[in-house]
A protein has these predicted regions:
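Signature of alpha-helical transmembrane segments and their immediate interfacial
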Residues: 1-34, 385-440
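Alpha-helical transmembrane helix bundles of large polytopic membrane transport and channel proteins
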Residues: 25, 81-191, 499-581
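Transmembrane alpha-helices and their membrane-interface boundaries in multi-pass membrane transporters
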Residues: 293, 309-325, 341-356, 360-399, ...
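Juxtamembrane segments of multi-pass membrane proteins
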Residues: 416-540
């Protein structure tokens, strides 16, 4: 080696080290997320946009459901009051509700001062003689009820009961039971609280801090026997991040230990072990950096998927360290690098389609795979030859592994017909059985069933069970959204009267549009007119008109009052409810994005659900109104997700075929390379189907990995068939050992992934571990011919020390 060449090689290693240091630093600066919004479409429908806004930044994403269980009624109520007080004073929450009236006084006063602008009963008829008489009679009838205690002090100022009607309009259709002054469950011994976290739903650190604060405050005040329950979107997101992080760490640790053990057994050298790990480290770092820079954040599932590079990227290091022993670095680059390069290109062709997916999560997986594999291959090509010019410095059990592989190569072709028949039978089975591709968006989430059950229980207790259907109304401005919500409300009132709906909640019930408030204000008569009508309406009744001067004064004051605006409710409990129903454009949305009003619907008791077609017909003509069926929309998102992934996987497969055809330039060779890959995919699919596994997007990604890994094996065996010499002489022990070692590391790493508690990661492992093993065995059976014996009839040697034929 010349001095100039040596300097160039040292410089290459120096550049690699600098790049790895930069990548490691960038990884520490990357943002890691765990919410499912990364797996939602980038070009959603209007209905899907509503759901996505709630998942990302909506008020729904900031809701924290709190339960206090154990103890007796008094203990739970006291704990609820003390916890609510502590949380309100912490500054971490916009609002905390537990059924107490604390904080309602200011809001109530503001509403009372504009009750005639807000009450749905106020119109021109309300202040006629007949309207006044009916209103007063209704109010007097309530004096003997439990509500009379609150009505009586207001009687002379509000004889028509607009305060009562306003309260009825603003209360949700269903509400939790109140006991000892706080909300409680109807079914279990539990006090209930609802908090709105100040941190954005996408701010998982802020959400985690708020949850930790709740736990700390509860621990400080809880009496004996009391336990805390937390749920809500933020709880799920924080727990999912922790689960994914824990699984990634566990899998990375277990995978590293397994790889270390396998490589030490194979190489018998710590130095070789360290060298084999370099492509893996480069691949993982490059993948994280590429996704972080390209997507702005790295999803936890993408990071978990990155641990699979341990299984594939280490193959490159093994190929070089083992195969370079008899050839040296220059010989390895000449003989074996073209095959490794072609295998890399086929992998990139398969994953390139994913990188252009309309789903950010799927695009992340594609980008991570491409970047990681390229970095691992380039590290093998340019760095390992400098650090280990003669390959692995150790021997270990490589020769025994190579001998065992050689024996397998002789025996497997005898099973070719049986394996072909098995593959055909598997294909027929897949054609006859119902499609196993039935995954759901929830299948990507690591939230356990127990946590989902607790969430459903808390929501049911609060009277906020998950709505199956809602109405979303888009409008260019907040005012227009309220006006359209009022129009929709008038249509829904008809359905309530017909028994089609039990009720609905609308932002316009809490904050009527300015136009509606001004119309009600215009219906208020002047003092003289009102006094005359009151005298007639109260004649012969229990309320003398002479005592209703406060009522007349209030009406006159409100004739001059400005309409109530959203800003007037800031800091009150009503603000949180309004924020959940009247949504501004998303912060990341383009200019001109619409406001959205959400109207939740309650189906009549005992019914299976709402008739969406009838709802759409009723709302026909209300601009921007859409009926959103939540579960069908989620199913549609995932179905589109899966359908797009299938098309992209198909395009990737076509790209692989085209690349191989261009390189091999032989239909026969192309067929024998593709046959074991196709058979491995079919057998894996049939096996998972027979086991009752519901297949989803991540299984599809796993199949791409099977093709990516298996193509290396198929191409190697294809080169054994290039000429007669390959048929008469078995490949050398080191080459065979490198194949077996690469396969073992892949199967072990993906086998560990199959044990993950995160379903999405487990899906990849369940697919690739058996698929990689099958790809090796089927390649050996379908491609490797039986070695021809010498003419004297003696059998050929199983293994030899001469290198295999170079690829062309």
């Amino acid at each position: 080696m010349t001095a100039g060449a040596a300097r160039h090689r040292v410089a290459a290693v120096g550049v690699w080290l600098a790049l790895m240091a930069l990548a490691a630093w960038l990884c520490t600066r990357a943002t890691y997320v765990a919410d499912l919004s990364a797996f939602l479409p980038s070009a959603p429908t209007a209905e899907q946009r509503v759901l996505m806004a709630q998942l990302k930044n909506g008020a729904t994403a900031r809701v924290l459901l709190i339960g206090v269980r154990g103890g007796d009624v008094a203990a739970r109520a006291e704990a609820s009051r003390r916890l609510a007080e502590a949380l309100r004073g912490s500054g971490a929450f916009d609002a905390v509700h537990n059924g107490e009236s604390i904080g309602d006084e200011a809001a109530g006063q503001r509403l009372f001062e504009r009750r005639y602008l807000l009450s749905p009963a106020v119109d021109a008829r309300r202040f006629t003689v007949e309207g006044l008489r009916e209103g007063i009679a209704d109010t007097l009838s309530l004096l003997g009820t439990p509500a009379g205690v609150r009505i009586k002090p207001l009687l002379w100022r509000d004889p028509t009961g607009e305060t009562v009607r306003l309260a009825e309009a603003m209360l949700p259709t269903s509400a939790p039971r109140v006991e000892d002054g706080v909300w409680v469950s109807r079914h279990v011994p539990r006090a209930l609280l609802v908090a709105s976290v100040r941190a954005d739903g996408a701010d998982l650190d802020g959400q985690a801090a708020a949850q930790a604060l709740v736990r700390a405050r509860f621990a400080a005040l809880a009496g004996p026997g009391l336990t805390l329950e937390l749920s809500g979107p933020g709880v799920f997101a924080v727990a999912s991040r922790a689960t994914i992080q824990g699984e990634v760490e566990r899998l990375a640790t277990a995978g590293t230990v397994a790889m270390v053990a396998l490589l030490l057994v194979a190489f018998g050298s710590v130095v070789a072990l360290g060298l084999a790990a370099l492509p893996v480290a480069a691949g993982v770092l490059a993948g994280i950096v590429a996704v972080s820079l390209g997507a702005g954040s790295v999803h936890g599932l993408t990071l978990g998927f990155g641990t699979t590079l341990i299984g594939e990227a280490v193959d490159y290091g093994i190929y070089y360290l083992v195969q370079a022993r008899p050839l040296g670095a220059v010989g390895w680059r000449r003989v074996h690098w073209p095959t490794v390069r072609l295998g890399l290109l086929t992998s990139l062709a398969g994953f390139a389609a994913l990188a252009f997916s309309g789903f950010a999560g799927l695009a992340q997986l594609g980008l991570f795979s491409i970047s990681g594999l390229v970095a691992a291959a380039l590290t093998t090509r340019f760095v390992l030859p400098v650090l280990a010019p003669q390959g692995s410095p150790g021997l270990g059990l490589r020769q025994r592994l190579g001998a065992a592989t050689g024996t397998l190569l002789v025996r497997l072709p005898r099973w070719r017909r049986a394996l072909t028949a098995l593959s055909v039978a598997a294909l027929a089975l897949l054609a006859l059985l119902p499609s196993p591709w039935r995954g759901t968006l929830a299948s990507l989430s690591p939230v356990p069933a127990a946590a989902l059950a607790l969430d459903a229980s808390l929501r049911e207790d609060l009277g906020a069970a998950e709505a199956g259907t809602l109405v979303a109304i888009e409008a260019p401005t907040e005012t227009a959204a309220l006006e359209r919500a009022e129009q929709a409300g008038a249509r829904l009132d008809t359905l309530v009267g017909q028994g089609v709906l039990q009720g609905y909640d609308s932002p316009a019930q809490r904050l009527p549009s300015p136009a509606t408030q001004l119309a009600r204000r215009a219906a208020l008569p002047d003092a003289a007119t009102l006094a005359a009508r009151l005298a007639e309406a109260t004649a012969g009744g229990p309320l003398p008109a002479a005592r209703l001067d406060p009522f007349i004064a209030d009406v006159q004051a409100q004739r001059q009052a400005a309409p109530l605006m959203r800003a007037d409710l800031r800091g009150t409990p009503l603000a949180a409810a309004l924020d959940a129903q009247l949504l501004p454009p998303d912060r990341d949305a383009a200019a001109g994005a619409p406001w959205t009003a959400l109207l939740s619907l309650q189906a009549p008791a005992g019914t299976a659900g709402l008739d969406a077609a009838r709802l759409r017909a009723a709302l026909d003509g209300v601009a921007g109104a859409r009926v959103v069926q939540i579960q069908p929309e989620l199913d549609a998102i995932y179905a589109h997700y899966l359908d797009q992934a299938r098309w992209q996987a198909g395009l990737g497969a076509l790209a692989v075929v085209a690349l191989l055809a261009l390189h091999l330039r032989s239909a026969r060779r192309l067929g024998r390379v593709l046959a074991p890959l196709a058979a491995a995919v079919v057998l894996v699919l049939a096996g998972l189907t027979l086991l009752g596994v519901t297949l989803g997007v991540l299984h599809l990604v796993g199949l791409l990995l099977v093709v990516a890994v298996g193509s290396n094996y198929a191409l190697f065996f294809d080169h054994l068939c290039l000429d007669d010499a390959a048929r008469d002489t078995a490949p050398d022990t080191d080459t065979l050992a490198s194949l077996l070692m690469a396969n073992l590391t892949t199967v072990v790493s993906f086998g560990l992934l199959a044990t993950a508690e995160v379903p999405a990661l487990a899906a990849v492992g369940q697919t690739v571990a058996p698929g990689a093993l099958l790809a090796l065995l089927l390649s050996a059976a379908f491609i490797t011919p039986r070695p021809a014996g010498p003419r004297d009839g003696t059998p050929p040697p199983l293994v030899g020390e001469s290198p295999g034929s170079p690829p062309k």
